[in-house]
Design a protein with these regions (language model features):
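Alpha-helical membrane segments of multi-pass proteins
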Residues: 2-5, 23-304
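Transit-peptide-like, low-complexity N-terminal presequences
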Residues: 9-12
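Cleavable N-terminal signal peptides
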Residues: 14-15, 25
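Alpha-helical transmembrane segments in inner-membrane proteins
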Residues: 19-20
Length: 304
């Protein structure tokens, strides 16, 4: 074969390979587009919508009534109302709409959803102290009955125990680690009921945890220690997910293809979400508490 013939053959082979590659890509592209187009981007869970509507409406009504009946403290209540609105909006964005739809198909989106609930919405709700506003929204007889119930020793004692620094830390940590065991996580993906239980345990555990850190009874030193150790163990779980050589959750294997990822790449992204942005949330809160503590000590020193 002449040199010119060899070059012509090589060019033909390259063209054929390119044609085959393009054909293969085009063959998979419609499948990916069809899979993405088939997603219900606005899934509706009636019970979630009902809870969001009820809690939001009661809080708004309660805040309006508080402002009508009290001449002082409006600035404090305004800050709490803004905190509640922020927590409510983050919860709604996490549980209703595209993020919830994506979380069923991408582990990384699932991690964004979980961290939004645990690291953003939960502390905002704790800062909002919504029980007072909800009580104002209820008929007076009901609010008094609820007040008597929650002040009973049989209720207050367990509450003081579970919101203690160590107990709340353990509940939050156990919920996080246990639900990321592959068999547990896969069970949540396979069952709507178990999935709801997973979200409830994450959210309730986070509320207890953040109450121990931001609540009225908090000790600044204990709160900073809790935040630091939580940042360490959540970063460890995130690192395990991000650096693992194998995918932990096989259910996602066929679901991530439509988004140009394989299951391991998706898991690595999810691990990074838990490792870095969520960890930054704990660090930022710890620094804020430390700064407030130092300012208080400085004021006490000047007063002395």
């Amino acid at each position: 074969m002449t040199a010119r013939g060899a070059h012509a053959a090589a060019a033909a082979a390259a063209a054929a390979a390119a044609t085959l590659a393009t054909s293969a890509a085009n063959a998979h592209a419609p499948q990916a587009i069809d899979a993405a187009a088939a997603i219900d981007w606005w899934p509706v869970e009636p019970w979630v919508l009902a809870l969001l509507a009820l809690t939001g409406a009661l809080h708004a009504l309660g805040v309006v009534r508080v402002w009508r009946h009290t001449a002082t403290g409006r600035a404090v209540h305004a800050r709490r109302a803004l905190a509640f609105a922020g927590g409510w909006l983050v919860t709604a964005a996490a549980l209703v709409g595209p993020l919830d739809a994506l979380s069923a198909r991408l582990f990384s989106a699932h991690m964004v959803q979980h961290e939004a609930l645990m690291v953003v919405a939960a502390p905002l709700f704790v800062l909002a102290r919504p029980l007072g506003a909800w009580a104002w929204a209820l008929p007076q007889r009901w609010s008094r009955a609820l007040g008597r119930f929650f002040h009973r020793p049989g209720w207050r004692t367990p509450w003081l125990v579970v919101t203690g620094p160590l107990a709340a830390w353990l509940v939050h940590a156990l919920a996080l680690w246990l639900w990321h065991i592959p068999s547990w996580f896969e069970a949540a993906l396979a069952s709507d009921g178990i999935h709801a239980l997973q979200h409830a345990s994450f959210f309730v555990g986070a509320l207890l945890y953040w109450w121990s850190v931001l609540g009225a009874r908090r000790n600044a030193g204990a709160a900073m220690a809790s935040l630091f150790t939580t940042m360490i163990h959540t970063a460890a779980l995130g690192a395990l997910l991000a650096l693992s050589p194998v995918a932990w959750y096989p259910t996602y294997a066929d679901r991530t293809i439509a988004f140009g990822l394989d299951a391991l790449e998706d898991q690595q992204l999810g691990g990074l979400v838990m490792w870095v942005p969520a960890g930054f949330g704990y660090v930022a809160c710890g620094l804020a508490i430390a700064l407030r503590w130092l300012r208080r000590d400085d004021r006490l020193g000047h007063a002395a």
